[in-house]
Amino acid sequence: MAKVIGIDLGTTNSCVAVMEGGEPIVIANPEGNRTTPSVVAFSKTGERMTGQVAKRQAITNPERTIISIKRDMGTDHKVDIDGKKFSPQEISSMILQKLKSDAEAYLGETVTQAVITVPAYFSDAQRQATKDSGKIAGLEVLRIINEPTAAALAYGLDKEHDQKIMVYDLGGGTFDVSILEIGDGVFEVLATNGNNKLGGDDFDQRIIDFLVDTFKKESGIDLKNDKMAMQRLKEAAEKAKVELSGVTSSNINLPFITADASGPKHLDVTLTRAKFDEITADLVENTMVPTRQAMQDAGLTPDKIDKILLVGGSTRIPAVQEAVKKYLGKDPFKGINPDECVAVGAAIQAGVLTGDVTGLLLLDVTPLSLGLETLGGVFTKLIERNTTIPTKKSQVFSTAADGQTSVEIHVLQGEREMAQYNKSLGRFQLTGIPSAPRGVPQIEVTFDIDANGIVHVSAKDLGTGNEQKITITASTNLSDSDIDKAVKEAEKFAAEDKQRKEEIDVRNNADSLIYQSEKSLKDLGDKVSADDKSKIESGVNKVKDALKGTDIEVIKKATEELQQSFYDISSKIYQQTQGAQSDPGAAGFGGQQEAPGAGQDENVVDADYKVVDDDK
């Protein structure tokens, strides 16, 4: 059976894993790293870069480098590169393609299916957008799974006794907290909460703001409008944040950060952990609000939690760990890798779907209440938040006016009492209702949430049996034709990448042959005739001229001709050497002399022998 990979599609970093021999294995990328930066960039010549290579060039190419695109999933945001507009789904698909390619290189086979994780607090539109990204990347997304739940799978796969655990997941761009009960292979989510606009990026931004303000006070120069300087500050801020998890102060030194009439300016600031904690204190507290709400929704007190799992790189921040410890009264469990455990959990879920992992049942929940707008702009909930999915719920409504022959079903997601303050998922019409006084027609609305957390809604006139069904697609989601177009674009990019690689291989091969030919001529010296030497030199010059151009076929042809000339001359020299070896009197290059005693076999006597055992 073909392998199904598990992917943690993160805001700042992504990770891919697979089940092998019953164990989840994290797949390293070609650079040798087990996580890949979620960065996409386009060079000025239009070449696409993804991952570490894209991140490395961000300082010199900030306007054409896309970071943290996950924060824009499910929105109508567009990235403009040379007049071409890319949706968040398309940019995310490029990251997924990179992970898919790395997995294929590791496995030695084509990968077409995946389980992809999303923040637990992702809306329906964001989940649908993630699924679309997978499709564009050439992946059938078998399941969308919540990140905290995936982390719990990674932790609890081999745990048999019952435990109540909290997964506190602070990633690069999102925050989630889930309360689960696990035991005997059953993983039941009791409650989940979160904030899709809170993550490590925000901690970085506080450091950037601090550096900008400090530099402005010292030099009078505002760096905010200098994109290259801001990119350098971003990298330095991220590095300082990481350092402050292990030391109490970090020196941020950026020479030549900018210049004015008096000359170049340098930034040199020392950031202490105490100052970092001070400027980010509200961010840490903002993670505790959903944490307390999730505990309340689960009906648990802190003493009932057996284990706290910290997930996401930002949970290494000491102030974050201290806040969690203070609230729950116990140290977090540190036996899982916060950067890899989500991908590992996704791989385990993939194993469940393929049958590689058995005896495991996952019961997840919907993070937000679902319902529709009713008379007066009220939000009427059909499915409450933290309901176990998949689930289905129906409720009967009626018309609001006499003679009404159609109704608009406005589907929403959220917790506010009034419809306008909740997230609109979509609208559809149920028509053909017989004219009747208001309140008489019976319209049954059914909400169905699948295991991916994606919503399907139907409305049925019980009087006529007339029914209308839709899978919710927000206005920000891509249509089927948009997805098909994006798939073709992705295939085109893949073909261009392949062609570019082939071009590099052809050029490298030509360079190698030039070096080999020139070295051989030098080493062989007089053994090569003047005509043959001239032929090789002519071929070398022809390849060098071809390399100056852009026509790959010309380079290939010149390389093949030089290769043939090289083979012909090598063969000729080999034959000459063999001829010298076969000359009986030759004792020169490759010649042989007769060994002493050779041919004197007349008086040879075969000696008898026996083995003597000294122990006897």
From Swiss-Prot:
Provide ranges: composition bias, Basic and acidic residues. Answer: 607-616
Q: Enumerate the residue ranges of region (Disordered).
A: 575-616
Query: Residue positions of the PTM Phosphothreonine?
Result: 174
InterPro entries for this protein:
ATPase_NBD, Chaperone_DnaK, Heat_shock_70_CS, HSP70_C_sf, HSP70_peptide-bd_sf, Hsp_70_fam
Q: Listed GO molecular functions?
A: ATP binding; ATP-dependent protein folding chaperone; unfolded protein binding
> Which CDD domains does UniProt cross-reference here?
ASKHA_NBD_HSP70_DnaK-like
Q: What induces it?
A: By stress conditions e.g. heat shock.
Q: What are the entry keywords?
A: ATP-binding, Chaperone, Nucleotide-binding, Phosphoprotein, Stress response
Q: Which domain of life is it from?
A: Bacteria
N-terminal signal peptide: none
What the entry lists under PROSITE patterns is as follows: HSP70_1 (PS00297), HSP70_2 (PS00329), HSP70_3 (PS01036)
The similarity annotation says:
Belongs to the heat shock protein 70 family.
Q: What does this protein do?
A: Acts as a chaperone.
What's the protein name? Chaperone protein DnaK
What is the species listed in this Swiss-Prot or TrEMBL entry? Ruminiclostridium cellulolyticum (strain ATCC 35319 / DSM 5812 / JCM 6584 / H10) (Clostridium cellulolyticum)
Q: What is the lineage of its organism?
A: Bacteria, Bacillati, Bacillota, Clostridia, Eubacteriales
Task: Report the gene name.
Answer: dnaK
